[in-house]
From Swiss-Prot:
It comes from the Bacteria. One of its GO terms (molecular function) is ribosome binding. This is Ribosome maturation factor RimM. It comes from Shewanella sp. (strain W3-18-1). GO terms for biological process: ribosomal small subunit biogenesis; rRNA processing. Binds ribosomal protein uS19. Residues 97-176 form the PRC barrel domain. The lineage of its organism: Bacteria, Pseudomonadati, Pseudomonadota, Gammaproteobacteria, Alteromonadales.
Length: 176
């Protein structure tokens, strides 16, 4: 299964809430309640993904808690604490042709406008002003770099993104 076919992690199950099997939810979606737009969820338990359905959810103070189908006791819920919550990639909304998900950029080759291969996108970091590509440099990098941090600022630094071809063209000095 390719990385784009792997489940997309949207959050994590937290600690138990009460005695009836409710769990706190940590959501990585833009809005906390956005995680509940997807059903069913996949829960990674003991290294294996299994399908679960949310029967209900609510705000509990500043936290969000949910009841999962088949989880009726505190003991059952405790077994799920810290399990990842994911969905299948096909459950995600289709995007317009010129847009992409951050996960699609992981593994893309980064080349600058002079043709220099800067490396491969390893991860993306959110900052207050703009997101930043963490690019793992090639083993034989001419500038001795191990990693580069390139601000994801379209037009200024990011010239083109070719998700199908797995390549990002940047206007960035390889010595930075």
């Amino acid at each position: 299964m390719s990385s784009n076919q792997q489940p997309v992690v949207l959050g994590k199950l937290g600690s138990c809430h009460g005695i009836k099997g409710w769990l706190r939810i940590t959501a990585y979606t833009d809005s906390v309640e956005g995680i509940f737009d997807y059903s069913p969820w996949l829960i990674k338990e003991n290294g294996e993904w299994r399908e679960v359905k949310v029967t209900q959810w609510r705000y509990q103070g500043k936290a969000v808690v949910a009841e999962l189908e088949g989880v009726n006791t505190r003991e059952q819920a405790q077994m799920l604490t810290n399990c990842e919550i994911a969905i299948l990639p096909e459950q995600m909304d289709a995007l317009p042709e010129d847009e992409f998900y951050w996960r699609d950029l992981i593994g893309c080759e980064v080349v600058n406008t002079t043709g220099y291969n800067m490396g491969i996108v390893d991860q993306i970091v959110e900052t207050g002003s703009n997101d930043v590509l963490l690019v793992k440099a090639n083993a034989k990098d001419s500038f001795g770099k191990v990693e580069r941090m390139i601000p994801f600022v379209p037009e200024q630094f990011i010239k083109t993104v070719d998700v199908q071809g797995k390549q990002i063209l940047v206007d960035w000095d390889p010595d930075f």
